[in-house]
């Protein structure tokens, strides 16, 4: 029979252990486990040796891959746009880099990698949803993502854009994938007292349109990303993670690629800049972000830069 003294000792021990167990579980929950990489960070490497680059990314510790288009099945207008811009970029490879979706899937599987999302152009979303979704299903990708959209002259233009996105999203659902919009800092300046990006979020069906937040470009657009994460819970499902060497803003409305290029020198590896990443990523988890994807656009020192960002992400512990 247990004495009163032993009972109290056992009870006290059990009570003391509860917070320790809880803290252990919380520590695990606050980690970002499967960090991804947007391949636009290292376009020349994947163009030169796709399989070898996937092996390198896996060895570094990345778990998820995000592709950028166009693809062999993409709409001609998207291919023509890509052909027009690549000479200034110094590379031309995109999509699956000459491989089929099945071949890519095999390479990813061999390296323990997955591909939750594919970036693609607007015309492909409107005209080639069938083959796009088919490739997504082969890879196991859930999201097809529009990386940017045209700036509109007025709120009526943004209303029409929102309605178009809603229709694209409904078509994506019919094909078994989900549509997301990466606004690239566009639509954040108020027009007649209304922020176009907020109009798009609120005018679209949450089942038809999700969002990919790029914390650098959204900050450059002058908004508080934490406020948006808290306000629109469940809408941001993917996030591009990078840092800002110093606090900078677009020279205009953020809708012009030239404005993006102006800020490239201020991109830096996660954890080495001025953004409060622990705060942002903690709110992102609570908001419903599923995939945290490192992006260092055209990384100057690819392997070094990607290692640095991943090390920071893996060591990060997020607040409650």
Question: PLM features: residue spans?
Answer:
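Active-site acidic/histidine proton-transfer and metal-coordination neighborhood
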Residues: 11-13, 18-19, 94, 111-210, ...
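Acidic/histidine-rich catalytic cores of soluble enzymes
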Residues: 172-271
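Alpha-helical scaffolding segments of alpha/beta enzyme cores, especially the outer helices
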Residues: 52, 56, 99-106, 130-138, ...
